[in-house]
Structures are given as C-alpha cells and as structure tokens.
Regions:
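Solvent-exposed interhelical
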Residues: 40-90, 96
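Final/C-terminal transmembrane alpha-helix of multipass membrane proteins
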Residues: 134-155
Length: 157
C-alpha cells in the first residue's frame, strides 16, 4: 500500500514512548507529544526520499506513493503532513514540557519546512521537483534533529 509509510510510522514513533515508560514507569502526555511529532514528520520525510529515489524503489518493487499514485499526489501529501506539524509542534509547550526557548525556534523551523514543502508542491516540472525533493529531504533530517535539540536546551535553561 502507498500508505506503508504512515502505517510503519507508528513503529518508528514508539521509541520515545517506550523510553519514557521505562524511565518513569508511566506513559505521559510528554511521551505522546514526542510520538506525535515523529509520527507526523515521518510520512513527508520518507515520501521526499521516495520522490528522488523512485527508480530504486521501482527496481526493488516497493510500492511507494510516487510509483503507485504519482508524483503530484505524493507532493500534495508531503505538503499536507508538513502542515500537520504546525499544531503538533505546539503540544510540548501546551503541556508545559517546554517553554518559549523551544517553541519560538520550533515554530520558525516548522514554518520554513512548510514553505519548502509548498515550494516542492508547486513545482510542476517533475525533473526539478525531484531535485528539490532531495533538498527538502535533507532539511527534514536537520529539522527533526533541531526540534529535539531544542527540547534539551529548553529543559536545561
């Protein structure tokens, strides 16, 4: 199924919940908010990868969205999932797990991520869109890393 990334995203998002449960002997809104950040980040991240590596997925006969549903639909879903990050990124602040040291830069990083995902979406020439997908993919790695660094910095201050 082309939704394999969403389904698999559950497993990929569980480590913070499991780690939190082991460390605190409970599951809390903190671990759930970390789960949701990773869960909503995962589809756009992997669909960006699948856009510029579509030939490899085709050779391996892995039914990634660009192959089953086309490039335009994949770009739309990348944009949708990046936009879903906006409310999710507020959760740690809302539950008082983090403060403004986290929230302000996290919002700036997320808005920029939305912008570049929109830029990818609006590119209709597939050749250029595939090159742009690689850049968006690279940023998405940096993005998630910085979000978690912001948690650490915010909680140390």
């Amino acid at each position: 199924t082309p939704q394999n990334i969403v389904i698999g995203g559950v497993a990929g998002s569980l480590p913070p919940v499991i780690g939190w449960a082991i460390a605190t002997n409970s599951i809390s809104l903190v671990s759930i908010s970390l789960f949701l950040i990773i869960f909503f980040w995962t589809p756009s991240h992997f669909w960006e990868l699948s856009l510029y590596k579509a030939d490899d997925y085709k050779k391996a006969k892995i039914p990634m969205m660009p192959l089953t549903d086309g490039i335009e639909k994949t770009k739309l879903y990348i944009l949708i999932y990046s936009l879903l990050m906006l409310p999710v990124i507020f959760l740690p602040y809302t539950i008082k797990f983090s403060g403004l040291v986290y929230l302000i830069p996290a919002m700036m990083l997320t808005i920029y991520y939305n912008f570049i995902c929109y830029d990818l979406y609006k590119h209709k020439k597939n050749k250029f869109a595939l090159k742009k997908a690689k850049k968006v993919f690279s940023y998405s790695i940096f993005y998630l890393f910085l979000i978690f660094v912001l948690f650490i910095v915010d909680n140390l201050i």
